[in-house]
């Protein structure tokens, strides 16, 4: 590689060059679906240093299409850093000069952790559609085992956005003694009927692709690209607000004249197709199906006759709940539903709705007020954990 094409110097507020690690587990993991994973791998990255008392660990939980690479660069050839680099690094909201940050790829994922693309030891072939259904609870149990492996008894904070926020909530309920603070961003305590409907449309787009082969597409040396492309296009529409789409694309055409056909004419069409095409070759379709079903299934209040306040009763840590004004996928009203339940249950909670034009995807971006509030809360976490001079 010509040195002129390499990044000359990594940003000063970057965690720098990072490398994934793999933890292998031979202790069987019983799953909510009734099946058991006899063994499995979890791929993860860490940023910062674990202190002597092991009290500065922070866990990052990823969203639907996320993975372990949340910050930094794998090489100087990388065009982009990890997916949450805007918030993880020296001096950033999740300050790696203070905190030891862990980010992993969940079970069922397609970025190294055991999932549909991995080999099923019982058959010698890829798991494919035989990989068991996962739930948010299953992920949290596996994450707790990773914490055990790393010698971390209690996290200073567990943090996540979107589906990651649901995992944070589940952590506070399943392992209240192991989480000192919870940060739930752009999330919901359960999906609405509309959100389940969006997920079902995406799944049907994938499953109806002739190249899907009932999930065994790898054995046919193909990919259900068309279906996954459509699923991602639908998803992107829900991740952006109407205002964001309007300001970014409006009704702009790719050329000066209408072509009176079905080829791409509007810039927004071009954008959606590009996003879909890119995703269709970089993400696994079976993983997408699993992740959306885990979203659908999450509903901690269901076991309490729909009483969310009763469901959150086991939680014992302070919460920061963040929503965004134009997020219509998980709107502020759903965050307030969680906040109201926490208040009724007598739990300490701080809530803010950030005025942002960027819709659901705002949780990924460096919004000024969002960063300030996030950093302030994490500063309090550091203070309460005695990490100010770490």
From Swiss-Prot:
Annotated positions for site Important for acyl-CoA specificity: 329
Major localization class: cytoplasm
GO CC annotations on file: cytoplasm
GO biological process: homoserine metabolic process; methionine biosynthetic process
Reaction equations catalysed: L-homoserine + succinyl-CoA = O-succinyl-L-homoserine + CoA
Record-annotated active site: 162 (nucleophile), 327, 360
Annotated binding of substrate, by residue: 232, 361
Enzyme class name: transferase
Keywords from the named record: Acyltransferase, Amino-acid biosynthesis, Cytoplasm, Methionine biosynthesis, Transferase
Residue ranges constituting the AB hydrolase-1 domain according to the UniProt record: 56-365
Molecular function per GO: homoserine O-acetyltransferase activity; homoserine O-succinyltransferase activity
E.C. number(s) listed in UniProt: 2.3.1.46
Pathway given in the UniProt record: Amino-acid biosynthesis; L-methionine biosynthesis via de novo pathway; O-succinyl-L-homoserine from L-homoserine: step 1/1
Key word RNA-binding present: no
Keyword Repeat carried by entry: no
Annotated Gene3D superfamilies: 1.10.1740.110, alpha/beta hydrolase (3.40.50.1820)
Compartment list: Cytoplasm
Function: Transfers a succinyl group from succinyl-CoA to L-homoserine, forming succinyl-L-homoserine. In vitro, also has serine succinyl transferase activity.
Complexes and interactors: Homodimer.
Membership in a protein family: Belongs to the AB hydrolase superfamily. MetX family.
PANTHER family recorded: HOMOSERINE O-ACETYLTRANSFERASE
Protein name: Homoserine O-succinyltransferase
Organism lineage: Bacteria, Pseudomonadati, Pseudomonadota, Gammaproteobacteria, Oceanospirillales
């Amino acid at each position: 590689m010509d040195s002129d094409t390499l990044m000359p110097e990594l940003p000063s507020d970057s965690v720098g060059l990072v490398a994934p690690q793999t933890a292998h587990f031979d202790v069987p993991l019983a799953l909510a679906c009734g099946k058991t994973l006899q063994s499995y791998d979890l791929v993860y990255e860490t940023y910062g240093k674990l202190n002597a008392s092991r009290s500065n660990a922070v866990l990052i939980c990823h969203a639907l299409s996320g993975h372990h690479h949340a910050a930094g660069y794998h090489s100087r050839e990388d065009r982009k850093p990890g997916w949450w680099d805007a918030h993880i690094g020296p001096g950033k909201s999740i300050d790696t000069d203070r905190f030891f940050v862990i980010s992993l790829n969940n079970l069922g994922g397609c970025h190294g952790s055991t999932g549909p693309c991995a080999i099923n030891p019982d058959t010698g072939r890829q798991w494919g559609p035989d990989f068991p259904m996962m739930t948010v609870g299953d992920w949290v149990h596996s994450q707790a085992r990773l914490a055990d492996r790393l010698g971390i008894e209690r996290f200073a904070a567990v943090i996540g956005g979107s589906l990651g926020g649901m995992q944070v909530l589940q952590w506070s309920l399943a392992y209240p003694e192991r989480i000192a603070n919870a940060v739930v961003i752009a999330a919901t305590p359960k999906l609405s009927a509309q959100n389940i409907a969006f997920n079902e449309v995406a799944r049907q787009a994938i499953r109806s692709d002739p190249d899907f082969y009932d999930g065994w597409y790898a054995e046919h040396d193909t990919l259900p690209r068309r279906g996954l492309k459509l699923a991602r296009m639908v998803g992107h529409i829900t991740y952006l607000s109407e205002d964001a789409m309007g300001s970014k694309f409006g009704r702009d055409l790719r050329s000066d004249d209408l072509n009176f056909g079905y080829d791409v004419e509007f810039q927004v069409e071009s954008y959606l197709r590009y996003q879909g095409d890119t995703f269709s070759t970089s993400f696994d379709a079976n993983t997408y199906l699993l992740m959306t079903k885990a979203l659908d299934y999450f509903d901690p209040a269901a076991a309490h006759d729909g009483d969310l306040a009763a469901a959150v009763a086991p939680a014992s840590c302070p919460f920061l709940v963040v929503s965004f004004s134009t997020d219509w996928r998980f709107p502020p009203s759903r965050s307030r539903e969680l906040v109201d339940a926490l208040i009724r249950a007598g739990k300490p909670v701080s809530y803010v709705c950030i005025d942002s034009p960027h819709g659901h995807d705002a949780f990924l971006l460096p919004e000024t007020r969002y960063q300030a509030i996030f950093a302030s809360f994490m500063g309090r976490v550091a203070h309460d954990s005695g990490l100010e001079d770490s």
